[in-house]
């Protein structure tokens, strides 16, 4: 294995040699600092100041050279533009072809500049990690907090990529114009949807896409789903291209997501009435609702593992289990069995294929459309969450057919039976197994892609976040061999068990998972007990409860649009995270019943605050989680999406069990008793957030 220092020397351009990071010198400095501090020759404050100044000098050297080279490229494009104007009058095809090649040469030089940025970014990441490890101090936290967000930050000058993107735009526009020397080709600025099919431009765009981490709406919503593209961390190549991508199969996965969320929430407004009709207490609704989440804890693991071999078969199995589960749920009333009802919900939980839906988007959708697909996953979930209760509110009827009861309690089961059998038929005739799955199943030995990887050497490593992820594995070649500093974490092999995945969790990741657990717990308490609480205090009907829950669900997408489009451009994610946690805490505190009189305005306003800011918190939390999580958790069975799903599912189980347990104290005490754990967990998550605040980048 070639260490990074040797690779840097081998790969750097000779004419740019003096402008690369002096990695060897800085590595020696780190060793000196360790020895000096151990001998008492220097204190930590002196070392931090000196090393910070040295790193500032290195970054400034890189930035100034980068700006200089961007200027040279801009000058060349300007001169070529003058030649283009003259050639358009002559319409000489051979000279136009030569001019097109000249533009492409500029593109090749731009690729070299991108490689320059990549090598230096990797060097800075590695020296920061080396300092943390050898010196025993979280220098990365200090350095990032004082440099990355400064108005004159040179780090932002590198990674905002404004100059490089402008050069790409100029190259694309001129090459597009030269495709039709009559000038009839539409401008890329007038028609943004038109993409230039030029190999150089496509390579540059792909590299810039990996290197740039600008905040935008699709990225925010896509990260909300915690669908972590493998190449966003490791630089590995896409498993799918435009030709093998099957849109209908993606649509079927999104439909599965939508129907499952409808299935989850359609029973919430009537679960308490159903349990009472079967002779149980109203608060047993917690068991009825939560049993689906209990089964999902296990189904998420086997579905995630199954998706390594197939996507079609897990979706078929999911549809069958959900059909059977809903059938039992609908029949439970006529057989007068609470056990049948709960078994039906357990079967529904065993049919949860959300892990497959996430995995399909991550592995089988081209990179350029993956964010849109991820946003579609979140949107389908939000729409299903709103449609479930709304649909339940419309099912206010009561009749019998051949002895089977159809009323507000059983109709959700019958409706979902029909929905899943229809979906299964659509799945059977329309789904296409991805090509790479077919190849892996038919060929025992994996095909070699070494040639392809050699061609993509420029992009190798561009995907890694620059400073936001100092605890991740930093480079496929690991730490320098001569120091024996490579951790097991630095391997790119995926985790092979939940225990192995847990060992990869840094304190920052653990805190983010705690926050995710907290917000899911608070939301589940709010939603699952809403029917019991509103009936007890306000005497709301099923239709009113359903409308209230539907309105809450409809806030999800607008909130994500506002946060993703505006708020994240004004504040850091970690600032939004803390503010949202505090607002959730305020919402929970407002929900407590302090006096004998509990009003509708108090309940509705506190519920809106809790739910809306929990949604904001979820988006920002998963966005941060996708950045601070190890690259080894971006793929394999035990991936980041599975861990977050398990954390959220366990939170739902705990919340529903809390509701049922609190029911033994009487409905008069239910509200305050169930809110108390939410309040305590929220306070704990806020404290934990402040403890890891400087590492949340």
Swiss-Prot record:
It is found in: Membrane. Residues 2-145 form the SPX domain. The chain crosses the membrane at residues 247-267, 278-298, 315-335, 338-356, 375-395, 411-431, 513-533, 544-564, 576-596, 604-624, 670-690. One of its GO terms (molecular function) is transmembrane transporter activity. It holds the Pfam family SPX. InterPro entries: MFS (IPR011701), MFS_Domain-Containing_Protein (IPR051068), MFS_trans_sf (IPR036259), SPX_dom (IPR004331), SPXM_SPX_plant (IPR045264). The keyword Protease does not apply. One of its GO terms (cellular component) is membrane. Its main location: membrane. Keywords: Membrane, Transmembrane, Transmembrane helix. It is a multi-pass membrane protein. Belongs to the major facilitator superfamily. This is SPX domain-containing membrane protein OsI_08463. It comes from Oryza sativa subsp. indica (Rice).
